[in-house]
Amino acid sequence: MDRVEALKERTGVAIRTMLKALGLSPSKFYQWKRRFGLPNRHNGKMPRDFWLEPWEVKAIVDYARRRPGVGYRYLTYEMLDNDVVAVSPATTYRVLKRHGLLNRWASPGKTGKRGFEQPRRPHEHWHIDISYVSIRGTFVFLIAVLDGYSRFVVHHELRVHMTERDVEIVLQRALERFPRARPRIISDNGSQFVSRDFKRFLALMQLQHVRTSPYHPQSNGKIEALAKTIKRDCIRVEPLFGLEDGRQKVGAFIHYYCYHRLHSAIWYLTPYEVLSGQAGKRLAERDRKLEEARRRRRERTAVDRV
């Protein structure tokens, strides 16, 4: 510090110019200047509110072992909501990595297409799609309507046929469930959705219709992801022994999906919480639990240091 000040007095060159020549930022120089002559104060022993107690580490590890295949972020918010332990996703990640319990995660592919405007409120966009379901070698058809904002399944049916009339029936029943909704209907270019009868039906219901471009996940990927989730976590897990058995099992899974399953795209809340406007309450409760846990750890660390 003294040399720099002396050099400035001798040459008249501004300190910032000298610091630039030395490759040193002014903020770092003045930080050193404020500390000049003071003893070093290491912060390694200062209490951290993310230091976990042994029981918290054990709770995270035990919970992860009971939920194999579940990502660390999902585990974090599930543990928080169920009052198992209150930690951040980063803390859960560190604990699981230390114990060799992290699941491998594949990064999603990128698409060059952009421009689809996402909904800002419930019932602004309804996505509709048809997916094939095999029941003992025979195909039936899952027709589902999904709210694009909340990811809530507005209505679904497992039907024997997939005609335009079947699509109309499913959409009509979805509208009966939410009679005040006037969403924009988003679909692919399947024959049912481009037919004249379907256009007349939408005009009668006073609904706008948007057909998506192929390979464009921003527009209709939400309901395609729903179909994949149902097949992966329900249909391929439990065999379906008939149409009624399939309707019962798929219906039970969709109820779980809407009311109990945390969704990564909506702040790890359930679709129903977002649809019904309860998201703020749940997020505030999580913040309260995390702050209480941090305060308790700080107090425990302070007692240990005495």
PLM-predicted stretches and their roles:
Residues 14-22, 75:
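Short alpha-helical "recognition helix" segments of helix-turn-helix
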Residues 1-13, 57-66:
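Short, amphipathic alpha-helical "recognition" segments used to contact nucleic acids or chromatin
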